[in-house]
Amino acid sequence: MIENVMKEGFITTSYDSVVNWAKTGSLWPMTFGLACCAVEMIHSAAARYDLARFGAEVFRASPRQADLMIVAGTLCNKMAPALRKVYDQMSEPRWVLSMGSCANGGGYYHYSYSVVRGCDRIVPVDVYVPGCPPTAEALIYGILQLQQKIRRSHTIARA
């Protein structure tokens, strides 16, 4: 983040770097737990893994207070409109993390008539976390990958 440190004690950097640094340290996740992956998602916020170390302090219950949606579990056709509605209510900038084989592509229930074959057909997904169910470590790694993606993004449009 810091490109230049001068002798007088000044630090020079770009506006994008400062804003993206602040975004990575203040993710506000919202739980969208649909199946067994939700247990691992909640497990990651407990004392053993302490998701708060990575800037995701408290899981939000309201989409208007969240900027990260973690879709964990099997998404059925009846739940798909609700997922889209909740996503549309989230504040900008917003990110989606798809957790588990069922959320990524239907998983074990891929050929069922009532299962959406991946939540990326309903909302844009930024990070995919594989596994059935993925461990809490895998979810934390996915959040770290999302933070890397945020650091590479541009806040100010390039001319």
From Swiss-Prot:
Q: Which organism is it from?
A: Verminephrobacter eiseniae (strain EF01-2)
Q: Which residues bind [4Fe-4S] cluster?
A: 36-37, 102, 132
Q: Which GO terms describe its cellular component?
A: plasma membrane; respiratory chain complex I
EC number annotated for this UniProt entry: 7.1.1.-
The protein's gene is named nuoB
Q: Is-annotated flag, keyword Nucleus?
A: no
* PANTHER family membership: NADH DEHYDROGENASE, NADH DEHYDROGENASE [UBIQUINONE] IRON-SULFUR PROTEIN 7, MITOCHONDRIAL
Full protein name: NADH-quinone oxidoreductase subunit B
**By its UniProt entry, which Gene3D superfamilies does this protein fall under?**
3.40.50.12280
Acetylation as UniProt keyword: no
Q: A single Pfam family, by name?
A: Oxidored_q6
Its chief place of residence is membrane
State the function annotated in the UniProt record. NDH-1 shuttles electrons from NADH, via FMN and iron-sulfur (Fe-S) centers, to quinones in the respiratory chain. Couples the redox reaction to proton translocation (for every two electrons transferred, four hydrogen ions are translocated across the cytoplasmic membrane), and thus conserves the redox energy in a proton gradient.
Quote the catalytic activity from the record. a quinone + NADH + 5 H(+)(in) = a quinol + NAD(+) + 4 H(+)(out)
Q: Where in the cell is it found?
A: Cell inner membrane
